[in-house]
Amino acid sequence: MLNAFTGAQVRAAEVPFLDAGHGNTLMQKAAHGLFLVAFEMLRSAGHSANRSSAVVLVGSGNNGADALYAGERLLRRGVSVTAIAVADEVHSEASEVFSRRGGRVLHLDQDNLPDLAARAIRSTLIIDGILGTGARGGLRGIAAELISAINTGAGERSVRSLLVVACDLPSGVDVDSGELSEPVLFADATVTFGAAKTGLLVSGGALAAGELNVVDIGLGMTTPGADTAVEPAMRRLEAHDVAALYRRPQVGDHKYTRGVLGVAAGSAQYPGAAVLATGAALATGLGMVRYLGPPAVATIINAVHPEVVCSTGDVEDSRSQAWLVGPGAVEDDDQARRARGAIASGLPVVVDAGALSEVPERVESSVILTPHAGELRTLLATRGIDVARADIEAAPARFASEAAQLTGATVLLKGFTTITAAPTGEVFSQAEAPPWLATAGSGDTLSGILGALVATLAEDDGVAARLGLPAGATWAAVAAAAALIHGLAGMRAAESGPVVVAGLPPHIGSVLADILA
């Protein structure tokens, strides 16, 4: 599990080391980690050191010093390195070490801005060391002009071979929310120090960061049981976490003990949503899927998935461990009634799409809402909070958490990064899904995966403990696991080209086979 922290948490963790005079030690560890990633990027791209050039963009703070020290290490390996100082003053000791190694420090001004921007664009590698975790807001003044010029010039190149690595975080990315303040130089990789920052796991920050590399500089924030350990502000599940929470079939199991998921989905207008959701649930592994809905939809489902037990009954008459309601269920009074019954049943329930409007003011955390940004906007508006969809997309963790605390539900907010938030404050962010999954029906398959996990774990009180999480994070962790499985299945499907979500179930099974191996 990847734990992420706010900028304030990381800075607070550094204070004892700085007070003890170990600031330079932390800086050298950070710089070395940055150098290793930058040098490996050059090597992996086929660039030899003595034929490569790098430009280090240097701000006034410690972030700029880290970048300069990394640049000095590149010089040792034979890379030609130039530093562009965007501030009047930069870290004097780092600048001196860099210069002694043969590096040039050029101070940016209006006269040389075009030439220095062109130099950066022509280089093999740029290290962005302008703003760090202590910065608030985006780039200003001449630094902003430089990045804008680089972005414009790099975009005009016929083939973008320029590599960019960000030092701690890309300049212009909010360290906590991930919101972007333009201009931002998007990175191929970000090397962050001490621990991951929440802004690098969500929203535009994750997109701008590229591949995330965390360098351990000895703060001990993520060491279990240590005095220096800190409660994460955000988490990201990894494959081994899914293996820990997934319920494997046991000797003596039968279809009822393996988990029964009731599904009230689909309508005359959108029958396919029910087919996709039930298929994904079956592929995830459980004892039985019971479908409640229109006979015409049931006929289609049974033609594709004959093992699904279909009826036109009500929730109260159906034996299930959990419910999935809402996918494709629009303008259907019977499906709306079933959604209300499932939400009121006291059983865990996944509430998607058309059923979101049936959620009462307050529910339990075992009610998992799965809106996209537009649906979350509507849900918040009905509770007196007026927010634009664009604002939700810019700061998804903030608004998913707000919705969870407002309703008492667990909230899974779909998007480029999938955010799950518990009403007790725990937040997860998953980013495995490829852009190919941004297609109709993708959310239906995600809800089916989640429904199956919820049904198999409905009577399992040990999920949180197995993951080392607070009990209140149980359903948020299960939702994050569903997002991870969905994303990895999408990645596997995308290996052969555009993704058709109807073909996703076999990939769900193969992903789980690898995870559980």
Task: For every predicted segment, state its role.
Residues 119-124, 184, 317-319, 343:
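A short, aliphatic-rich alpha-helical micro-motif
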Residues 1-86, 198-353, 357-368, 373, ...:
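Small-residue (G/A/S/T)-rich helix-start motifs and N-terminal tracts that mark the onset
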Residues 124-125, 130-232:
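Internal gly/pro-rich beta-alpha loop/helix module
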Residues 92-94, 117, 176, 300-301, ...:
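Short Asp/Glu-rich motifs
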Residues 90, 111-113, 169-175, 198, ...:
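Short acidic loop-to-helix transition motifs that present clustered carboxylates
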